[in-house]
From Swiss-Prot:
Keywords: GTP-binding, Nucleotide-binding, Repeat, Ribosome biogenesis. It comes from the Bacteria. PANTHER family: GTPASE DER. Residues 3-166, 177-350 form the EngA-type G domain. Belongs to the TRAFAC class TrmE-Era-EngA-EngB-Septin-like GTPase superfamily. EngA (Der) GTPase family. This is GTPase Der. One of its GO terms (biological process) is ribosome biogenesis.
Amino acid sequence: MKPVIALIGRPNVGKSTLFNQITKSRDALVADFAGLTRDRKYGDATYQNKSFIVVDTGGIGESEGGIDNYMAEQSKTAINEADIIIFVVDARAGLLASDEQIARELRTLGKKIYLVANKVDGVHAEAALVEFYKLGMGEPLQVAASHGRGVQQMLEDVLQDIPEDENPEEHDKDTGLRLAIIGRPNVGKSTLVNRLLGEDRVVAFDQPGTTRDSIYIPFEREGRKYTLIDTAGVRRKGKVDEMIEKFSIVKTLQAMKDAHVVVVVVDAREGIVEQDLHLIGYALEAGRAMVIAINKWDNMSEYDRKQCKLDVERRFDFIPWARIHLISALHGTGVGELYPSIHRAYESANLKVSPAKLTQILNDATDQHQPPTVQGRRIKMRYAHMGGQNPPTIVIHGNKVDKTPADYRRYLENVFRKVYKLEGTPVKIEFKTSENPFEGRKSQVDERTAARRRRYIQKFKKAEKKFKR
């Protein structure tokens, strides 16, 4: 098991920046706003052949109510999961009462704790750090996370008792099925994640935009590995005023590309809006397998349910291959039925077929319904092979195949879907026109052959003149 290291501290001391330095990524949103990081965030990291998991937490704030109090509960959960705790303080701001309160709570846990003083750049370090000795946690490790200064030395100290990996490849194994939960703000994404996980893992708070980061959560179900990605709620670009929300949109789009399957959550009570369709469009551009979850289905009248179903059939007619589920994430109704559709979409997206079988299906399809003619000549499709997975990509070679019209492309897509029972994934078909490999090449002959050719030509011309007489 990889050891877990939790970054703990009050808001805006630089935990997310330190997280990025440790994991060598921009996984945690970084901006100069207190309370920006609202959930536990997991990241894999390796330093000097030592693999571990880093958990970035929301700051333990001084507010007693609302979301700040909920953030504190999330941080405490992360502390319980951790093997090692890095307690981050702000060298510029100095020792605050909230730092002392956190230190008192941490000392009661019996875990290995390292005190890290961040933002030591631009201050007299020795003078600034004296007061932190009052916390009784020994000498603070000095870092300037925004510049990466002191981070390597900190890791050497923190990881000194962690053994090196016996087999580094073991830590690079597949994370399992990566599942991204996407949707507009406040449609119930975090509630669905909590229901899927069976624990109160991400902040599910009645406030649009509560989840600002994409959170990667590894878990197992019935012996199968998953990584659940809870994405930030995506607003229309016109309504994105805060820099934080712009960051979150980027994170959502990145999470789509990182996922194997995307679950698009739609609010049944608000109906399908343009932003829902835009999100599906983004997922299609990323070529991701997809399952639609119509949430908040409970407590709707029979008339509203009927109208919702009609709206779904009408607005989602461009993705007839996507499974649609009517669920209530809050009460768990229909949530368990998502898994079979997710698995089917994943299997379809990772289709692998030999070129011989694909070519046979292509030949059967063209025999049954011939390709159209282009400039008086019929398109000739010769053979097909797989060009990739997720999405399944089929490459067709032949003469003038790049001129294939859209309706015949759809016909071929439907044939492949029917034969291999592909559900929940877009199918990409690429056409490559066969080229004459000798086109543009000049014949290269030796001098002897060239001389013989000239003699034959002269002899032919003499015979032709003699015949004309």
